[in-house]
Structure formats: C-alpha cells, structure tokens
Amino acid sequence: MRTLFIGDLHLSADRLDITQAFTRFLDTELDDADALYILGDLFEVWVGDDIALPFALELAEKLKQVSQKLPVYFIHGNRDFMLGKQFARAAGMQILPEVTCLNLYGVETVILHGDSLCTLDKAYQRFRKLRSLSLARWLYGCLSKKTRQGIADKIRSNSKSSNQQKSYTIMDVEPNAVDALFAKTHTKHMIHGHTHRPAIHLLANDCQRIVVGDWYEQGSVLSVSAEGINLQSLPFEHTT
C-alpha cells in the first residue's frame, strides 16, 4: 500500500485537459492507495463555495466517489484559500491545518502547501498574512460574487506580472525557513508544492524535502510507502 500526494493542479474551465487528466488519475492510480493528499492550489482560483463552476461541481462528485474508498485530505493553497467546508463536504475531502504532521510508515513527516516557506518574497508574505486573517476572509465573503471575481482576477494579473520580475531565489523556499519548520515539528521529511519545482532534496541530519510538481504540462505524483518514496510524472493523454 502507498500514500499519494499531489498539488498545484490549477484546475480551471480554460484547461479542461488538466481536469480530464486528473479524472483519469483518480480512476486508474488509487487501487492500492491508503490515502490521497492534495497540497493546495487544486483550483486556479476559488472565490467562494457559492459560485463553484460546473466543472468543479462535477469534480466534487468524482472526489466524493473516491472518498468512499479511501480518505481524501486537502490543504489550502494560495489560489484556493477560500475553498470552504461546503465544497469540501460535497467532495468528501477533509480540510487539514496549513501545516500538518503525519507518521508515514514510521517516518515523521510534515506536509504543507509551501508558500509559507518563500520568506524572501516579502510582498507576497504581507498579502498572505492579510488574507489569513479571519476578519479579512469574512469581509471578502460578504462581497458580491461579481466583486469577488473581479478582485481575484486583479490579484492573478498582478501576481503574474510581479512574478515575471522576481528572481528565481526569491520565488523558491528559503533554507532557514525550512530548517526552522523541521526544528519546530521534530520531523525528518517535508512534503510540499507551490514552487512548481519537483525534486527530492537530501539535507543535513538525514532530513529530506520533497517537492511535488504542477500539472500544467504533465501530472506530478509523489508515492510514499514502507519501501520508500517515488516522485513521478504522468504524461497527459492528448485526444483529437
């Protein structure tokens, strides 16, 4: 048996090929799985459970079917931090704290989306602190659907423009932040996404940091079992 980790699918109505690839994954890759963990940014944008698009509602039904066979866990990302209990319940997902510790086949492991580790990106960390406030989230939820969508579109546009000007280092995790989280959680393995740079990093003190990749051009899945870890790519099946 094995436990699977994915993240950064950025599903949207504009990229239904990714949704189709994810659906195939759910149909074919979970027979021997103990659990599925989704480490944030399942959706490209999420402005509230009350305006979920049809493709997202169909996906919720699919995830609900999966959850009847194995547990499905979700950690918020920076694109879908407004995903709430209503959609999670419809999808059969259990929402976890943004930093969660697990014992994976005898190895103490911490999992998270990963944006909190990019501490050199000061502007983003200020925004992240603001949107984590309960009051800010509540006020945002009180806005009209049109206004929320407009704000989300503006944030996405500004983020894309800003990221094009940021250095590779600023947009990656900061080593001191990684070390601090290992020390705080007393873990040996760390699993996260967000950076879109899939890799297995071997660190000091027998620690490992595993980064799951995005799903823009191909799928990325981390499989963890008692035998070890396997970070693999899943090519998309292009149909005509």
Swiss-Prot record:
Keyword Nucleotide-binding tagged: no
Cell compartments where the protein resides: Cell inner membrane
Highest taxon, organism lineage: Bacteria
Catalyses which reaction(s): UDP-2-N,3-O-bis[(3R)-3-hydroxytetradecanoyl]-alpha-D-glucosamine + H2O = 2-N,3-O-bis[(3R)-3-hydroxytetradecanoyl]-alpha-D-glucosaminyl 1-phosphate + UMP + 2 H(+)
Cofactor binding, note field: Binds 2 Mn(2+) ions per subunit in a binuclear metal center.
A GO biological-process term: lipid A biosynthetic process
UniProt similarity note: Belongs to the LpxH family.
Function in brief: Hydrolyzes the pyrophosphate bond of UDP-2,3-diacylglucosamine to yield 2,3-diacylglucosamine 1-phosphate (lipid X) and UMP by catalyzing the attack of water at the alpha-P atom. Involved in the biosynthesis of lipid A, a phosphorylated glycolipid that anchors the lipopolysaccharide to the outer membrane of the cell.
Protein name from the UniProt record: UDP-2,3-diacylglucosamine hydrolase
